């Protein structure tokens, strides 16, 4: 039986970092549109898995220690292929050693069991403060 949209999105947050990444890559559509919030260090819209991995996830992995996105609540939008995740980012910026916690909301749009669009909302000021020397 195919996974529900909620199960697909939960699988990208609730395992180990490596299993979350594997599940995310499997769930992304070929031409997924991924938008990081304006003001966030990696802000912008990226099209396709390669662009997302290069501009977002490789940087998160190389520039931060123990960077996490912990979800507190999921919302499934009835009649739409949309899942909303509310949670908290945390981690330490390697260059400064500063730790942070910042609230986020992620909006996921799916089609036929694949993620076609992602949009991030976050208090980017807190993240940028952790990056300041």
Regions found by a protein language model. Give the residues of each.
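Phosphate-binding glycine-rich loops and adjacent basic patches that engage nucleotide phosphates
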Residues: 13-24, 49, 67-72, 91-92
